[in-house]
Amino acid sequence: MAEKENTKRNRREEILQALAQMLESSDGSQRITTAKLAANVGVSEAALYRHFPSKTRMFDSLIEFIEDTLTSRINLILQDEKDTFHRLRLILLLILGFAERNPGLTRIMTGHALMFEQDRLQGRINQLFERIEAQLRQVLKERRLREGSGFDHDETLLASQLLAFCEGMLSRFVRSEFRYRPTQEFETRWPLLACQLQ
């Protein structure tokens, strides 16, 4: 029984990895059909539906992976780091680095892969970025408590500026067919971003 469950889980993971790889390839700029995905995995469409009730559920699983990975690592940063600027830098670097290591998933994060899918999938991505923006805002607000001084500008504006930088770098990565890495020149860009926060 346990062996059958492992085989099923492995097949699910294989399907999700194939979908992510297709999103990374030139197929990712077009609608990915279950027929194409089944051919890529080497199974029938019926076999896909034994593991996932719909293609939407496959995208849900990939979005869940993105959410879990980013949220858990942001929480670790907040737990381990106390300096505001260091926290912000690490959170941005986390988002950019995750995207760089997972180009196919970046198409989901930017919404490109979701254009032909159900609207609620884009809603989930929107909520993820809203939660990240809220965490950035909280880090900025906590500076006054932690370090005794706040910022000259509204924390909401600053948080949205930081997130807009990340989203812009992810869009550039997708638009360039993954040539321009999101972390490229980050160490040069970060001081410019940090200056805007002063």
UniProtKB/Swiss-Prot annotation:
Pfam families: SlmA-like_C, TetR_N. Gene3D superfamilies: Tetracycline Repressor, domain 2. It is found in: Cytoplasm, Nucleoid. One of its GO terms (biological process) is negative regulation of division septum assembly. Residues 33-52 bind DNA. One of its GO terms (molecular function) is transcription cis-regulatory region binding. It comes from the Bacteria. Keywords: Cell cycle, Cell division, Coiled coil, Cytoplasm, DNA-binding. Residues 117-144 form a coiled coil. Signal peptide: none annotated. Its main location: cytoplasm. SUPFAM superfamilies: Homeodomain-like (SSF46689), Tetracyclin repressor-like, C-terminal domain (SSF48498). InterPro entries: DNA-bd_HTH_TetR-type_CS, Homeodomain-like_sf, HTH-type_TetR-like_transc_reg, HTH_TetR, NO_SlmA, SlmA-like_C, Tet_transcr_reg_TetR-rel_C_sf. Residues 9-70 form the HTH tetR-type domain. One of its GO terms (cellular component) is cytoplasm. Homodimer. Interacts with FtsZ. Belongs to the nucleoid occlusion factor SlmA family. Required for nucleoid occlusion (NO) phenomenon, which prevents Z-ring formation and cell division over the nucleoid. Acts as a DNA-associated cell division inhibitor that binds simultaneously chromosomal DNA and FtsZ, and disrupts the assembly of FtsZ polymers. SlmA-DNA-binding sequences (SBS) are dispersed on non-Ter regions of the chromosome, preventing FtsZ polymerization at these regions. This is Nucleoid occlusion factor SlmA. It comes from Edwardsiella ictaluri (strain 93-146). The gene is slmA.
